[in-house]
């Protein structure tokens, strides 16, 4: 098989022009505007659903107006001003956003499939509630604007997040207890807060009149909805921050990796897998899986790009708790992936993590995967986040050494970390010593 990671991807944009007022319909007219894009830029105004907010969207809205009907299901973001109808006002509104000279509400779909807005453009300082905000900052090139964070954020490992210990401490943040956090945030001078934002905090800040925008997006696919993926979140966040080009660099990498993995998904006899999330009790296993609504936890989202299928049916909560004996007997996937959480810092010695992997692999001794040596382990903090696609070639090479090139996997992950993170690694050999980032194979099978 071709092991090339990179392919050229072409996007053709079809545009047209016009101008009238239309309401939503369920029309699916073959002669109407053509949906041309990826559908992952979840910003209102992105009428043609590609990865850009630009003049082609203006033309698409004009074309919809000329057609006289708006298929809201097919073109949800044609409603640039988010008022429920598509009119010539949306054309003017989008032009104002593109001009970027006057602060204008830019609406987007955030985590939980909820619509929020930011005042665009916003070039002020940024506060973060969780590490997702720090991740976004590094990918998009706005890390130097992050000056404040929760108490938790100030304690993150400074290898991955340089200067985290020097952030202004905004205190503890909980979705049900955010009063002190909100007060500290309002005093911080930050005009943006990124990470997980409880809807109640979002509403409270808006009601306060304080000009603080909230970007409720994640660098991990911990969402029950299929459209809020790692890629769509980074792209959407990039456009909200005026850093679309940086976001599209990540998208280009993700596209190349997804094409690479998809090429190996062609066979019908796919291996089955199950993800055992941070197993610590030999008697009971928590298994991450897909949500019934299409989304997935970050580890499952990433691993699903490999030529495997989830052995466990989708669940309303994205996770199922199961007796270990029952798991080994009745689920019994071809491959078990142990998803470690909090087991290691980025630069923990790999041999220390391997001991943890081998200890927890013992829980599955009666499974076919254990007997055949097909238990592997990942660190959720890398595989379950935006770094996952960068590291996934390594996991593929462990599972199928004849199909995936291990050296290429190391090189790809190393290049990824150099481009999209602030980790200081001088060589691939340095990366191999990052026990909290890399992947593992059990070493205890008979």
Residues of each region from the PLM?
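Secretory targeting signatures
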Residues: 1-29
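Short helix-initiation/N-cap motifs at beta->coil->alpha
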Residues: 111-113, 167-181, 315-325
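Structural recognition of the beta-strand scaffold that forms the well-ordered cores
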Residues: 125-129, 138, 145-150, 191-196, ...
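A short, structured surface patch at a secondary-structure boundary
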Residues: 124, 128-187, 192-198, 311
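Extracytoplasmic substrate-binding proteins
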Residues: 103-107, 201-285, 374-444
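Alpha-helical, coiled-coil/dimerization segments enriched in small aliphatic residues
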Residues: 154, 287-319
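Sec-exported extracytoplasmic/periplasmic mature domains
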Residues: 63-70, 96-100, 141-142, 186-190, ...
């Amino acid at each position: 098989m071709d092991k090339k990671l990179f392919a050229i991807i072409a996007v053709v944009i079809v545009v047209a022009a016009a101008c009238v007022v239309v309401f939503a319909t369920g029309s699916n007219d073959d002669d109407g505007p053509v949906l041309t894009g990826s559908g992952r830029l979840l910003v209102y105004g992105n009428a043609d659903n590609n990865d850009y907010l630009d003049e082609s969207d203006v033309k698409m809205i004009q074309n919809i107006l000329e057609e006289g009907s708006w298929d809201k299901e097919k073109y949800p973001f044609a409603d640039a001003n988010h008022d429920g109808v598509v009119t010539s006002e949306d054309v003017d509104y989008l032009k104002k956003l593109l001009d970027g000279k006057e602060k204008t509400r830019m609406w987007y779909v955030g985590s939980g499939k909820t619509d929020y807005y930011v005042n665009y453009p916003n070039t002020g300082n940024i506060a973060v509630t969780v590490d997702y905000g720090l991740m976004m900052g590094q990918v998009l090139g706005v890390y130097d604007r992050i000056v404040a964070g929760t108490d938790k954020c100030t304690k993150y490992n400074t290898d991955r997040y340089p200067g985290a210990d020097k952030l202004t401490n905004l205190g503890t943040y909980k979705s049900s207890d955010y009063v002190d956090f909100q007060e500290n945030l309002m005093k911080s001078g930050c005009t943006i807060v990124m990470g997980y934002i409880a809807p109640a905090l979002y509403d409270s800040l808006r009601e306060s009149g304080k000009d603080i925008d909230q970007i409720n997006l994640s660098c991990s696919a911990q969402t029950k909805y299929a459209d809020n993926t790692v890629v769509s979140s980074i792209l959407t966040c990039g456009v909200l921050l005026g850093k679309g080009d940086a976001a599209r660099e990540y998208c280009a990498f993700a596209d190349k990796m997804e094409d690479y993995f998809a090429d190996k998904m062609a066979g019908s006899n796919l291996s089955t897998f199950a993800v055992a999330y941070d197993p610590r009790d030999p008697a009971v296993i928590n298994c991450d899986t897909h949500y019934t609504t299409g989304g997935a936890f970050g580890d499952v989202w990433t691993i699903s790009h490999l030529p495997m299928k989830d052995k466990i049916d989708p669940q309303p909560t994205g996770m199922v708790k199961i007796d270990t004996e029952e798991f080994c007997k009745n689920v019994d996937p071809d491959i078990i992936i142990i998803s470690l959480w909090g087991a290691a810092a980025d630069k923990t010695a790999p041999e220390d993590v391997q001991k943890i992997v081998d200890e927890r692999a013992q829980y599955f001794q009666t499974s076919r995967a254990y007997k055949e040596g097909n238990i592997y382990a990942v660190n959720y903090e890398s595989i379950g986040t935006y770094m996952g696609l960068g590291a996934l070639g390594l996991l593929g090479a462990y599972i199928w050494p004849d199909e995936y090139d291990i050296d290429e996997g190391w090189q790809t992950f190393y290049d990824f970390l150099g481009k999209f993170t602030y980790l200081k690694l001088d060589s691939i050999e340095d990366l191999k010593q990052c026990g909290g980032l890399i992947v593992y194979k059990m070493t205890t099978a008979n």
